[in-house]
A protein has these predicted regions:
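Fe-S-dependent hydro-lyases/dehydratases of central metabolism
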Residues: 1-235
């Protein structure tokens, strides 16, 4: 069991994905084989449940057996909002817990990052690739389709329009999330910006539609960017 101690707080412009990309940068896609990663520390308390789900989901990229977060006040708040408060049981690490290894991550030091072809651990800062032209953008998937994720994207799009040479699609996590985003006007902002909304289901991340063009460049918020997973090994 490996302790991942999170301290500090994410800067504006950084998202939860930065945390797991930093893990991939350090550990690599095979470095986590046989390991269980337990995320603890003051930085964890600031991460809401969907954010923790993103990190846990992408523990698979590390080769991890599983990833664990505490069932703390954030989980309590989430279950209460879902009308399931009675299901909450606090589950925290023992104060004297012993670990096989420890990884320290100061969230305040993280920069916006991106995983480049063709392995999830080929991590670079956004500054390294920001001038590259792209043909396709996909927003959503299991790892970035929560209310907060899509609302942030809509905020960026507000008052702008997708470039005529770019195909941009978005898939929301669930019907509940979709209705909340519609209620608050975020879906309308995306539609006005020229973003095409996809059905709530598996899709572009596992090559069910939206396959990139030959030798094309796609930017996706989805996980598992292994070669060919999007449907075209040349992209």
């Amino acid at each position: 069991v490996v302790k991942v101690n999170l301290t500090g707080e994410l800067k504006p412009g950084c998202n939860t994905k930065e945390i797991i990309l930093e893990m991939l940068r350090r550990v690599t896609i095979k470095g986590g084989l046989g390991n269980v990663y337990e995320y603890v520390g003051p930085g964890v308390a600031k991460l809401e449940v969907p954010a923790r789900a993103t990190i846990s989901n992408m523990g698979a990229e590390l080769g991890a057996t599983t990833s664990i977060f505490p069932a703390d006040e954030q989980v309590h708040k989430f279950l209460k909002a879902q009308g399931r408060e009675e299901a909450y049981v606090e589950l925290l690490p023992d104060e004297d817990a012993q670990y096989d290894d420890c990884i320290e991550i100061n969230l305040s030091e993280l920069e916006p990052m991106i995983s480049c072809p063709h392995q999830p651990d080929n991590v670079m800062t956004l500054k390294d690739v920001e001038k590259r032209k792209v043909q396709q953008v996909f927003i959503g998937s299991c790892t970035n389709a929560s209310y907060a994720d899509i609302a942030k994207a809509a905020t960026v799009f507000k008052g702008h329009h997708v470039n005529e040479n770019v195909s941009c699609t978005c898939a929301v996590a669930s019907k509940q999330t979709y209705r909340e985003l519609m209620r608050d006007g975020y879906v309308d902002i995306l539609l006005q910006a020229g973003v095409r909304m996809l059905e709530i289901a598996c899709g572009p991340c596992c090559a069910i539609g939206q396959t990139p063009a030959t030798n094309g460049v796609a930017v996706r918020t989805s996980n598992r960017n292994f070669k060919g997973r999007a449907g075209n090994p040349t992209a």
